[in-house]
């Protein structure tokens, strides 16, 4: 729904997202707000956590979660407006690569990608 509020986004946490996919048994998900990343040269992602000097890609027990520090990686951006894109084939290659990277990292098919606040801004893959 369009509320008039600014659309805000932060780096995706692949560790927590993968855990959520596993716990919920998800097999097909939507990646939303991809258009907000449109003019970033690099897109940050939390690819792992550092806990007590150890790097892990597994979601930690709640008792140690507070000690987890994000380990960031950076993906190439696409530096163009994608809000008018309506097909997967018309998406810039770097945007498709980002979606496929997230899909592989979380172990779940991304069947829908939103590229704007409008109802028509949903791409079915």
Segment roles from a protein language model:
Residues 1-125:
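Non-transmembrane, aqueous-exposed alpha-helical and coiled segments at domain scale
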